[in-house]
Amino acid sequence: MKIAVLPGDGIGPEIVNEAVKVLNALDEKFELEHAPVGGAGYEASGHPLPDATLALAKEADAILFGAVGDWKYDSLERALRPEQAILGLRKHLELFANFRPAICYPQLVDASPLKPELVAGLDILIVRELNGDIYFGQPRGVRAAPDGPFAGEREGFDTMRYSEPEVRRIAHVAFQAAQKRAKKLLSVDKSNVLETSQFWRDVMIDVSKEYADVELSHMYVDNAAMQLAKAPKQFDVIVTGNMFGDILSDEASMLTGSIGMLPSASLDKNNKGLYEPSHGSAPDIAGKGIANPLATILSAAMLLRYSLNRAEQADRIERAVKTVLEQGYRTGDIATPGCRQVGTAAMGDAVVAAL
């Protein structure tokens, strides 16, 4: 099995190195091939997603991705900025389903900004559609307003749109995920205001007829954002569009105490996927050896589970992470009084030892 390893920028190389260390410690050996991406790709080839990197990603069975982005590239034109690499990979590999778990480990309850009783036992899966919605809808741009109270003045505009096949395929993914959990699925939209959201809701209801064992419910996105902070344990699997999912998954991540604990998977129709931590490249702490590698290590576990069909090995990694937390190991972002605070490499070593 070939894994494309794309460390990227900032803390990306440091945290990916620890995930690779864990993969190499397993009984099974994988072919790991590294390539530059993001700012590193731009430095190597003049583009954030070099042709050779894209070719490797297409050829591999799965992709382990670090993070991209750095302030020093902010002056580049948009198409050349590091962040375009992840958008390009999603597009070229047809990755349309994003899985973002939000799990509050018992050992980290006190690190959450919410009261312990609100987050103890929290286990949410957010399924976000990645390829449609207002992020990619056309037309978009800046122009002189053709009408309205400020006709002739400059205005910015975007287009929110979803096709039925796009909604149906993410619906099936979400329903199937719910079948493997508590058989509850919440669809989040804004159907009281947006035609696109009403269409989304109608398609979700239609697809639900194929999943009689799953209870489908609906919630407006503003209420969902409030309920995530008020009573997050009411949720199990949430499915939503690209923009709403982008916002809600970041909110859910902070319920757990640190975004440094949260993995993510972006999958195509055949479960080939790109796996990355939910956090960014954090250039302000790059090279200091203090970044939390656990989200990336857990992303490697998701890679084994979903793309390589190695559930037993994925379970081993997840158990090892829990063991390390039980032993009191903490990076600075999740440190609590009395813990054993360690750096990036030492945390990776602890997970390997726990294996």
Curated annotation (Swiss-Prot):
It comes from the Bacteria. Pfam families: Iso_dh. Substrate binds at residues 90, 100, 128, 222. Keywords: Amino-acid biosynthesis, Branched-chain amino acid biosynthesis, Cytoplasm, Leucine biosynthesis, Magnesium, Manganese, Metal-binding, NAD, Oxidoreductase. Its main location: cytoplasm. GO terms for biological process: L-leucine biosynthetic process. Pathway: Amino-acid biosynthesis; L-leucine biosynthesis; L-leucine from 3-methyl-2-oxobutanoate: step 3/4. Mg(2+) binds at residues 222, 246, 250. It is found in: Cytoplasm. Binds 1 Mg(2+) or Mn(2+) ion per subunit. SMART domains: Iso_dh. InterPro entries: IsoCit/isopropylmalate_DH_CS, IsoPropMal-DH-like_dom, Isopropylmalate_DH. Coiled coil: none annotated. Gene3D superfamilies: Isopropylmalate Dehydrogenase (3.40.718.10). The record marks 135, 190 as: Important for catalysis. GO terms for cellular component: cytosol. Belongs to the isocitrate and isopropylmalate dehydrogenases family. LeuB type 1 subfamily. Homodimer. Catalyzes the oxidation of 3-carboxy-2-hydroxy-4-methylpentanoate (3-isopropylmalate) to 3-carboxy-4-methyl-2-oxopentanoate. The product decarboxylates to 4-methyl-2 oxopentanoate. This is 3-isopropylmalate dehydrogenase. It comes from Burkholderia thailandensis (strain ATCC 700388 / DSM 13276 / CCUG 48851 / CIP 106301 / E264). The lineage of its organism: Bacteria, Pseudomonadati, Pseudomonadota, Betaproteobacteria, Burkholderiales. The gene is leuB.
